[in-house]
Amino acid sequence: MTKNCLNQENCIPIFSENSSGDFFSCNPWLLFFNRNKINYQIFSLKKNDTLLFNSSSRLYIILIGSLIITKVLRNTHKVTLNLLTTGDTFGQIELVDDNFYYEAEAIDKTEVACINYTTIIKACSNCAPFNLFFVNHLVFCSAKAYHFIEIISHKSITSRLASLLLLLAEQNGTQVNNGIMLNFTITHKILAQIIGSNRVSVTRILANLLKTKLISIQKKRIIVHSPVLLSQRILNQ
């Protein structure tokens, strides 16, 4: 997982010179914060733990793990906005609106660093390399967000689910003998929540993918056997 962070397009050499050892000692964000004596907090989240924020001027950095970002309206209706993984960030300068709030739910064990946004802005002003790093990071995150919107915009629920499985395999998968195994267990309910469907539909589609041997389940984890064939299922919908 360290490799995923250090090889992202948004990282520059000054923040990733140490590529060995403990993950937190070579994380580009923490390297910069520690070297410049910048205060930050780290939260450890278990699966299904949730961070709520409705008036915040903080930046949250996912050091390791995955989070679902959801907008919760006053009538408790939820809208999934994004699926974030290791190296991604979320948060805003400030939000004051009684009509909604945001929540971030962990779908596996997750470590999140938290820092005041004013501190980030000050660091960008005082350090040109960090400013470039941060701008490139925002561009990278915008591209990922656009890709996620494309996934959940499919008219076909099957296409949404197949696209999501491919995304999870790419961002949170490990190569095994018979395909790519997701690094964590994920319930049908969570999959349905992410793609804006229901558990019954997701269960039916997964059963079909299992029957056609495009995926399998091992130790409660999904294995994508052939990303190419699974992507064909999207094109044929």
Curated annotation (Swiss-Prot):
UniProt cross-references to InterPro entries, sorted A to Z: cNMP-bd_dom, cNMP-bd_dom_sf, HTH_CRP, RmlC-like_jellyroll, Tscrpt_reg_HTH_Crp-type_CS, WH-like_DNA-bd_sf, WH_DNA-bd_sf
A single Gene Ontology CC term: chloroplast
Keyword terms of this UniProt record: Chloroplast, DNA-binding, Plastid, Transcription, Transcription regulation
Pfam families: cNMP_binding, HTH_Crp_2
Record-level Gene Ontology MF annotations: DNA binding; DNA-binding transcription factor activity
Main localization of the protein described in the UniProt heading: plastid
Protein location: Plastid, Chloroplast
The protein's name: Putative HTH-type transcriptional regulator ycf28
Organism from which the protein derives: Pyropia yezoensis (Susabi-nori)
